[in-house]
Amino acid sequence: MSTTATLDTVETRIADLVSTFVRLPQGVRLDESCEPILQATTHQAVTSSEGGKRLRALLALDAYRALGGDAGRERRDAMLDLSCAIEVFQTAALVHDDIIDDADLRRGKPAAHKALAGPGHDAALGVGLG
């Protein structure tokens, strides 16, 4: 598998995992007034996870292959999910860092806390995170 194909696979899987994670469980309903906030937060979670070099995920996948990783689909998929989880964790660390530093941009786009600023979002979001 080429690095480009792997990178595309990682990007797609991260978007799928993040979208699935922030989705409400079946049958759970929020008050209508919460819907715009949920949609904005879901969109921002996916947007914050886009981009980056994905070196951690690619290195994890390469190490798995180099160490004779099982070629079975189930194990490959589990390793892909693990490598994507590493990237999502890194994104969470970057979002935290941006809040602490009150950064305006991340990867050329508004930082998550800036993108979500406005009605329904408390400016004191990062208080106590230091």
Residue ranges: model-predicted function:
Residues 1-85, 91, 95, 102-120:
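Conserved N-terminal diphosphate/IPP-binding helix and adjacent helical/loop segment
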Residues 119-130:
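Short, intrinsically disordered, charge-balanced linker/junction segments flanking boundaries
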